[in-house]
Amino acid sequence: MSLVSKRIRFALRLLAAGLLSASASAELRPLDDGELSAVAGQGLINLDALTYGGYEYTRLNIGGDMKLLTNIDKLRLGNFARTGSSNPSNLGTVSNQAADIAIDNFALGRVDNAGSANAQIVPFEIRDPYIELAFKNNGNGVREIAGVRLGFGRARGDLSGDIHSLTGTMEGYINGPASIALEYYKQTHSGCDFNCIALSIAGDAELYSKVQLVKEGSGDVTQNGVPINRATQIGVANGDRFHTTDAFLDGLLPLLATQGGDCKASGLPACFPLLNYKSIFVGDRLNSNLATGGAQGIFFSVQGQNVPWQDLADKSKFIQTQAGAFANFAKYTDGNKDIYPFAVALYDALRGTARVDTCIGGKGC
């Protein structure tokens, strides 16, 4: 609970500082009835209250857009020892990382032509950010803070960092021609075995799959019956498989491209270190309209117990989080279509992605 309290105090201090600076630069004056009747819109800041599953929630919504270029040397959330059976979620720990979320050189946004006089900042865009508190009565009937989260209505842009561990939901989409997979297979294997022949037959048919946080070596997404935490890899989960747009080949792929608990599919790696991906693009890279191209439902939370948070991408659902820290980059549904918060080309999935520039020339960050 002390960890939660520290995060909450920091968030409230930051919010108070922003409000004070805003009020100091604005002149307040009364409006007469005529002026009021000409005004339409909603408040910049509003509060929502919700009760669910024995929890009470208060959410402070900040209506508006933000553009960020941010660099943080070390981001650590949920930095505590996960030992003992008092917290059942400890049974899901799959690495020796010291924090639930551990990212070095964390950055939002990028800089194009960073080393030239024509350097251009391409910010990370956020719409309708919010801070939310969850409350619950303890055994003595005292109302306590159970958790706090920071989230966004929409988000779009480059996220960079050396990701050592993640806890939560990280769902993405990889796709690319089978010929890319065949080329990689030939570079990493001698001869042409059954997998090689199958990929050759597939030709340029598109392969695609969902990827998520997985346990290294097996691709499991649970351990001892609970969701994994402190994951160091992302990939095709144990039991999932690659699909293809070719109907005939898709019927054969379950025999060829299913991840069977060894982090391989069609002889190719199906689980990848998070450290391989120095930058990912959140949202739709091809749609620059934040209202339609921004990813929904993203949040970071810290809680002293397992807290269900409302999924703002689908308010009829709640996302179960473990005690500790949690990052939510989950897919959501728009009509009949699944939308993933990020997509990676098959070529990059196999080889990793380079970091985009996040500083301007010699000026530093």
Which residues are covered by each model-predicted region?
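Low-complexity repetitive segments in secreted/extracellular proteins
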Residues: 1-51
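Long, compositionally biased low-complexity segments
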Residues: 51-365
